[in-house]
């Protein structure tokens, strides 16, 4: 018995049982606009500190066509809606349930001010909580948190503390908590006026939607208005606001009567301390109306006393509005509950005392990706759109098809139900019987009217493989999924048809034929004259074996064999594309592209597919570092890169002997597209990690690339740029560009940032560098980080490394026996553990193998220790 007790005491503590939060306290990467800190919920938050009305740094060159170029915002959201909380104090709500629309677009010129703020009337004074309209001498604070936006105002003996948030979960609603405190020694009477604008706007059409006449439900304290049925949306959502907590002493819906001569800063109705309840007139489509939702709360506060009011705002089906209001009226402390769920969900990473900022970055990245999810009624699914100017700006479309599929990759390990929804959403964009998938989607599941690309199928295939292998949810692939245009087939059938279509694009030189749009790099076909892409063949050389592993797990041996053979053939074909320094980009007719210049796109995929031998890998990494990262480049070019590596060398580099399609993103590029792309650098980070132990210092190079592609790195390098502090565009300028701190693709100067590539690829690349890889039989844990100690815990998988031990856990969506492979720690005697008990193991090729019996949704722990 004593011996057994000793064994039990020696068992490593289960990693899944650790509940402590890792340290994310660091100011590194704050930029010039404010400071990062850890809030009372234990989550990263950013305090915006500059006065945008006075400080010239607030003016953003990338918003030169915006109504207010000092706009700075942070993303709010849950699994259903997205919202932007602005430095000025208002919040805009975005909905994709039906048409893609801003529900309450800010337009000062037309008297629409978005919402999520209010006015306190007391002692004959009006106190606005908008930052621009704050009273003289008032003390204020603005915080952008992971899950909320907070504003505080102290003036005239009162303190107002506001939180706007989309409660964690799947309801299409924003909540606004307002706590008002009497800071004086005598009783005070006051009135709070809650304000929400109603100004639905479709970016794709660049026009407002029509509205009916607002209605008031006196029993439930709900204001609502129907949107006009027009175009393809014959069943539009109803916009609503409701008082959930606190007294109600009047309501208003007519903005002209509410603001009157006092305007935004001091509305006439607030000055009168009265709301008249008259209904705003209906609004014709294409016209901006004067509809608003205002609610008055009369208050009496004892000395030092405080009251918390709560309001809801959203857009939903008419029958759902009452349900949503009832649910959140009954909720106790919904803000704290929502934040607790975010705090439990975000990844917990530890990478050493000097990298608390990196742990913060991963939490913020995970929050950004998940809060960027929306629900689309036409697909009965959630999707994680690309965001940014593509979704919310002038394009107003869900483009491109491949984007949600890459954004779901890290969610496979953090929110698998959401990832599965994205997979099903994407599969239904496939035309009946297979064929070319459209470039993207418009609202109501309509195809985007843009030329297609030749890589759409492969992204569907890869994301499906990642999901199936990681979650073991093989039943999803039997689920019936509609085709675009009619008909239904199992998800597995969709994947087989995608494979057939992808292979129908084979070109004469072993690559895949392009259209004018090209492949990943949009318009590469037209700009480069490229008729055949070897980027796609390199990608498929990696993807097909992964899908083959899923096919084997499903028992589809015939398809698995077909995929494996094709993957081997592609690897062989890619080896012939070696130029002696790197791999080619493609063909223009019979002419090879990329013999005298390195294109960044295909290199990582050749590495991931296992194409280069050891010597070629060393040569390739040397070329990447020299030409794309700028290490050892001529000093006059401006390198090395302070943020991500470039996709192109510098046109002025004397060692470049081929140029095509420049000047590209930001200028100065030798080849199209150029610039530093967060997705492509995610591939590069991951690929460099795979060469750890093959190429000297490859693991260190991978960590270096990961860190340079963080928001913190951009804010540290270019502290005066807001674009890159809380979010960023899909691309930034290269290190040799005239303005290396600028970001964006120069197609829209009214919207910037909030694109999902950077957070999604930061989080996914981190899981790969941590060594987490699902396999046909289970999982492989082979750390690539050059750190003696680190840990990374996500909801569905985790790993912790220290000298002499590796601990981990998996929490699959479906149970069964898994084979776990763990890199053998250095030491003389290996012991394997499962669930705290010693188990039999084997060692092969440096990997310790154990069997793990799992239950759906439950954590199964393992460990490998040495003496």
Predicted regions and their residues:
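Aromatic-rich carbohydrate-recognition surfaces in CAZymes
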Residues: 119-121, 397-404, 408-510, 533-538, ...
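An acidic-aromatic substrate-binding cleft motif
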Residues: 27, 31-36, 40-49, 329-398
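Non-catalytic C-terminal accessory modules of carbohydrate-active enzymes
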Residues: 93, 98-162, 169, 670-673, ...
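Polysaccharide-binding surfaces and accessory modules of carbohydrate-active proteins
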Residues: 110, 165-274, 295, 327-351
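Short, well-ordered beta-strand segments enriched in hydrophobic/aromatic residues
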Residues: 80, 174-182, 304, 805-812
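Extended glycan-interaction surfaces of carbohydrate-active proteins
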Residues: 143, 352-396, 421-443, 497-530, ...
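Short Pro-Gly-centered flexible turn/kink motifs
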Residues: 79-82, 188, 235, 299-317, ...
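An extended acidic
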Residues: 17-38, 77, 83-154, 230-277, ...
């Amino acid at each position: 018995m004593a011996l057994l007790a000793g064994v039990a005491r020696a068992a490593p503590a289960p990693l899944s049982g650790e509940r402590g939060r890792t340290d994310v306290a660091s100011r590194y990467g704050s930029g010039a606009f404010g400071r990062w800190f850890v809030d009372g919920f234990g989550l990263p938050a950013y305090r915006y500190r500059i006065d945008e009305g006075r400080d010239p740094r607030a003016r953003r060159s990338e918003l030169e066509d915006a109504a207010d170029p000092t706009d700075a915002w942070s993303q709010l959201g849950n699994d259903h809606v997205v919202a932007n909380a602005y430095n000025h104090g208002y919040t805009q709500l975005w909905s994709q349930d039906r048409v893609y629309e801003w529900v309450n677009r800010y337009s000062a010129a037309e008297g629409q001010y978005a919402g999520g703020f209010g006015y306190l009337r007391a002692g004959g004074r009006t106190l606005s909580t908008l930052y621009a309209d704050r009273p003289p001498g008032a003390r204020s604070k603005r915080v952008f948190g992971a899950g909320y936006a907070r504003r505080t105002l102290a003036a005239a003996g009162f303190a107002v503390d506001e939180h706007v948030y989309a409660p964690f979960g799947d309801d299409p609603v924003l909540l606004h908590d307002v706590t008002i405190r009497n800071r004086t020694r005598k009783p005070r009477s006051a009135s709070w006026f809650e304000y929400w604008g109603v100004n639905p706007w479709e970016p794709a059409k660049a026009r407002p939607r029509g509205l009916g006449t607002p209605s008031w439900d006196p029993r439930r304290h709900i204001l609502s208005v129907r949107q006009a049925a027009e175009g393809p949306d014959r069943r539009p959502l109803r916009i609503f606001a409701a008082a959930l907590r606190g007294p109600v002493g009047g309501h208003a819906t007519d903005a002209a009567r509410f603001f009157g001569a006092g305007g935004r800063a001091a509305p006439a109705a607030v000055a009168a301390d009265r709301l008249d309840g008259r209904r705003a007139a209906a609004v014709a489509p294409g016209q901006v109306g004067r509809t608003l939702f205002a609610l008055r709360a009369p208050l009496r506060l004892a000395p030092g006393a405080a009251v918390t009011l709560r309001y809801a705002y959203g857009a939903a089906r008419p029958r759902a509005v009452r349900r949503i209001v009832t649910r959140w009226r009954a909720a106790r402390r919904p803000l704290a509950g929502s934040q607790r769920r975010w705090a439990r969900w975000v990844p917990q990473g530890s990478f050493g005392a000097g990298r608390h900022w990196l742990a913060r970055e991963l939490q913020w990245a995970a929050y950004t990706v998940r809060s960027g999810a929306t629900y689309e009624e036409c697909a009965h699914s959630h999707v994680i759109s690309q965001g940014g100017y593509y979704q919310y700006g002038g394009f107003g479309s869900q483009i491109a098809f491949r984007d949600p599929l890459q954004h779901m990759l890290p969610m496979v390990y953090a929110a698998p139900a959401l990832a599965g929804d994205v997979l099903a959403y994407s599969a239904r964009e496939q035309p009946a019987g297979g064929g070319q998938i459209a470039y993207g989607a418009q609202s109501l599941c309509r195809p985007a009217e843009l030329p297609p690309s030749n890589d759409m199928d492969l992204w569907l295939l890869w994301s499906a493989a990642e999901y199936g292998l990681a979650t073991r949810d093989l039943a999803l692939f039997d689920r019936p999924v509609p085709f675009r245009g009619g008909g239904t087939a199992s998800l597995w059938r969709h994947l087989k048809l995608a494979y057939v279509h992808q292979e129908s694009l084979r070109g004469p030189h072993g690559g895949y034929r392009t259209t004018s749009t090209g492949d990943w790099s949009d318009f590469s076909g037209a700009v480069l004259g490229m008729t055949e892409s070897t980027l796609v063949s390199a990608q498929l050389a990696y993807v097909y074996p992964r899908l083959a592993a899923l096919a084997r797990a499903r028992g589809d041996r015939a398809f698995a064999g077909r995929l494996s053979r094709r993957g081997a053939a592609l690897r062989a074909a890619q080896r012939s594309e070696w130029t002696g320094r790197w791999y080619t980009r493609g063909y223009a007719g019979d002419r090879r592209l990329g013999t005298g210049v390195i294109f960044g796109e295909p290199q990582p995929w050749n590495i991931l597919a296992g194409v280069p031998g050891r010597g070629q890998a060393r040569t390739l990494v040397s070329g990447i570092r020299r030409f794309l990262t700028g290490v050892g480049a001529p000093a006059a070019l401006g390198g090395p890169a302070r943020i991500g590596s470039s996709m192109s060398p510098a046109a002025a580099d004397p060692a470049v002997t081929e140029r095509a399609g420049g000047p590209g993103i930001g200028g100065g590029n030798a080849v199209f597209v150029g610039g530093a792309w967060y997705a492509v650098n995610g591939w590069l980070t991951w690929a460099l990690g795979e060469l750890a132990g093959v190429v000297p210092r490859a693991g260190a190079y991978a960590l270096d690339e990961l860190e340079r592609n963080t928001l913190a790195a951009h804010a540290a390098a270019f502290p005066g740029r807001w674009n890159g502090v809380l979010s960023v565009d899909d691309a930034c300028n290269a290190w040799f560009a005239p303005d290396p701190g600028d970001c964006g693709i120069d197609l829209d100067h009214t919207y910037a940032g909030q694109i999902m590539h950077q957070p999604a690829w930061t989080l996914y690349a981190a899981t790969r560098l941590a060594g987490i890889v699902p396999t046909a039989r289970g999982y492989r844990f082979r750390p690539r980080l050059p750190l003696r100690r680190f840990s990374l815990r996500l909801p569905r998988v985790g790993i912790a490394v220290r000298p002499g031990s590796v601990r981990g856990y998996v929490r699959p969506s479906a149970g069964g026996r898994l084979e776990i492979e763990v890199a053998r720690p250095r030491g003389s005697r290996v012991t394997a553990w499962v669930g705290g008990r010693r188990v039999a193991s084997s060692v092969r090729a440096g990997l310790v193998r154990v069997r793990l019996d799992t239950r759906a949704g439950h954590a199964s722990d393992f460990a490998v220790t040495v003496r």
